[in-house]
């Protein structure tokens, strides 16, 4: 929906499959965009295409995130956190360093971005955090990722309680498997949805009137059975997921 008034959206993780879909959906809805991602070349290309301001940095870099936000003369109406990494293995084989890396990318950066954004979020604004169904259905081999997403969900609930009286909504978008490069190595009993579907959900949330509070939207693709074809199953995360699915199928 094209809005009559100028609106601004900050998207963190803008060059990933989901982040890029969110950027395109909000651009189509008439938003001025502030884009952030770690990979400078694709970020620069996307920003040029969408006429956006951008900052190439990690989502944990509060200084650069604040500088990007500072370019929005009239504040921010929508904040989308879609950054993250899917990395790791079963706990016996996963280092503490890898655990810390996953938590930093998927959880700590959420707080950094929200903390940097809040002074500039307009009344009636919405903070949208892209979570995952693994937050409530943790998967073997994804201990750090599942813990990070569960932490994001708890953070969102606490933030919503704090900010609702200020006229700022906090919403979680929790998709099942999405067809993105990050998910290509995993296996699931549910069909993967295109990233554009997540972008559509985010744009729909952004278009809602502020009086509508939507704490969480959870969705997935259609069920396709306990066995699924896997790409890159030899990888530690993919192999662990495949083993878990096979074990579950054998018990039913």
Predicted features and spans:
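Conserved glycine-rich Rossmann-like NAD(P)H-binding loop of the short-chain dehydrogenase/reductase
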Residues: 31-46
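Rossmann-fold cofactor-recognition segment
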Residues: 49-63
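Residue(s) in the substrate-gating loop at a strand-loop-helix junction
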Residues: 132
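C-terminal helical subdomain
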Residues: 172, 187-232
